[in-house]
Amino acid sequence: MPTLVLSRHGQSEWNLENRFTGWWDVNLTEQGVQEATAGGKALAEKGFEFDIAFTSVLTRAIKTTNLILEAGKTLWVPTEKDWRLNERHYGGLTGLNKAETAAKHGEEQVHIWRRSYDVPPPPMEKGSKFDLSGDRRYDGVKIPETESLKDTVARVLPYWEERIAPELKAGKRVLIGAHGNSLRALVKHLSKLSDEEIVKFELPTGQPLVYELNDDLTPKDRYFLNER
């Protein structure tokens, strides 16, 4: 029976500052390190082991994945990094404080940008200090100007089908350390959630979500580790 564990990264510096982060690369806070380590220890104590791990190309997710593996004394497990597991791109909201943004644009508009399925935030302005066009980790990648959750799903699922699903079908035990919205894309796909259901689905930082899957990768069970 294939096992899949999804873990959102631990608290980041911009989670703490209540800023829209998206593709911008920020580090974990001390609390974030503790969350990731605690999640890894809880997985190890409950007998979870992994054969392969997948993560994004952003520091907060990479470190979380490594801390989970290290807690289980399996830092040697092969880990693949790919930009398609990055967080949703928040476009022109990147770097802005969420409360300040609500004061400027209105809480209702910000709620639509954050929690609608198919409405993206305004695009990032040309010349923004958060422009990533010169970042070599994205060589050959068409960096989005902004993304809705629907757009995020559209880039995550091909990677799932191409790289992750085959490992699970081969019986591998898989860990994915990523972000709230890229993981929502996978939960929507696996659990067949509607557009309305997935925007309400919350993934706490550093809390592993376990899928026990049938051989055809339909879910047999899904639960947060702290629920069992």
From Swiss-Prot:
The organism's place on the tree of life at top rank: Bacteria
Q: Does the keyword Secreted apply?
A: no
Query: Per UniProt, which keywords does this protein have?
Result: Gluconeogenesis, Glycolysis, Isomerase
What's a Pfam family this protein contains?
A: His_Phos_1
List, alphabetically, the SMART domains matched: PGAM (SM00855)
Record-annotated site: Transition state stabilizer? H179
Q: What is this protein called?
A: 2,3-bisphosphoglycerate-dependent phosphoglycerate mutase
List the taxonomic lineage.
Bacteria, Pseudomonadati, Pseudomonadota, Alphaproteobacteria, Sphingomonadales
